[in-house]
């Protein structure tokens, strides 16, 4: 599994002050642009892409309805993504499929979509249907992150992930059970067939995240002969 770490600057100054050396052990950088005001995103973008030039980067606008920090209309959401993607060509573009389903066809020009679904309230009973619909669209990555309230929620998501990966070996999946009880899903990504795990540096971007340094230690232990 690859380790993803999010950067969440709230201003141009914060973006310029990012110490990239602290992110060297991350495999992929996620820029959570939703921590900025809508009108500041394009002003901050050059600093982010310059800082992390040569690194794999995900551009993410996490809206409030999926646990993020920004409120945008469907049109604003797609327009911002297209503008940033057109100028800077991020390696991956996060698209909240179920929240902006009516705009999905406008995103088909991008071959590097991370079709995502986030639920900070629960692990819904229709997880299989959610995974099935996202998988049927054959994006670059299928990403599902849901809140776990008990051990069964975690085991269900891990089992679904393993099953979908077995049936769709060419498809990249990223699945996360959020919350303390779900931490095992972050550690066991290789076991379930999840391609990435999200780790934190300074501030967690979701409940239950483990620090980058601890995730590296866990990887070393699991990879010992």
Curated annotation (Swiss-Prot):
Name the record gives this protein: 3-dehydroquinate dehydratase
Positions annotated to bind 3-dehydroquinate: 6, 30-32, 62, 186, 205, 209
Keywords: Amino-acid biosynthesis, Aromatic amino acid biosynthesis, Lyase, Schiff base
EC class of the enzyme, as a word: lyase
Active-site residues from the entry: 118 (proton donor/acceptor), 143 (schiff-base intermediate with substrate)
Domain of life assignment: Bacteria
UniProt-listed GO biological process terms: 3,4-dihydroxybenzoate biosynthetic process; amino acid biosynthetic process; aromatic amino acid family biosynthetic process; chorismate biosynthetic process
Pfam families, per database record: DHquinase_I
Subunit field text: Homodimer.
GO molecular function, one term: 3-dehydroquinate dehydratase activity
Swiss-Prot/TrEMBL catalytic activity: 3-dehydroquinate = 3-dehydroshikimate + H2O
Cross-referenced InterPro entries: Aldolase_TIM, DHquinase_I, Type-I_3-dehydroquinase
Keyword Metal-binding: no
Family: Belongs to the type-I 3-dehydroquinase family.
Protein purpose: Involved in the third step of the chorismate pathway, which leads to the biosynthesis of aromatic amino acids. Catalyzes the cis-dehydration of 3-dehydroquinate (DHQ) and introduces the first double bond of the aromatic ring to yield 3-dehydroshikimate.
Pathway: Metabolic intermediate biosynthesis; chorismate biosynthesis; chorismate from D-erythrose 4-phosphate and phosphoenolpyruvate: step 3/7
Organism of this sequence: Streptococcus sanguinis (strain SK36)
Cysteine disulfide links: none
NCBIfam families: aroD (TIGR01093)
E.C. designation(s): 4.2.1.10
Gene name as annotated: aroD
